[in-house]
Amino acid sequence: NILQFRKMIQCANKGSRAAWHYLDYGCYCGPGGRGTPVDELDRCCKIHDDCYIEAGKDGCYPKLTWYSWQCTGDAPTCNPKSKCKDFVCACDAAAAKCFAKAAYNKANWNIDTKTRCK
């Protein structure tokens, strides 16, 4: 679920960067996505997008699926409940952890995706 994902991001990065910073970053962070990721953070978003696609193939609705999780230290941890909930939670938790490890390059925020994402 998008709202839970936002909170997971805050958990993983210890509140150092608001989730909205990732909405228009690179070629894959935010709606849509195409081309080659511009950096490691953008690659995290592509992996997350691909994970959601796989969840959809399994009959799940990733953007709408509510799941159970908790913030343990600086790591989101999923609480197993059902196949879809676990799948989507794992997608979001992995992405949040990936975001926390990747550098944020302000030059890759709000880029011209038509020219840079081929």
UniProtKB/Swiss-Prot annotation:
One of its GO terms (biological process) is arachidonate secretion. Keywords: Calcium, Disulfide bond, Hydrolase, Lipid degradation, Lipid metabolism, Metal-binding, Secreted. Disulfide bonds join C11-C71, C27-C117, C29-C45, C44-C98, C51-C91, C60-C84, C78-C89. One of its GO terms (molecular function) is phospholipid binding. One of its GO terms (cellular component) is extracellular region. Binds 1 Ca(2+) ion. This is Basic phospholipase A2 PA-15. The lineage of its organism: Eukaryota, Metazoa, Chordata, Craniata, Vertebrata.
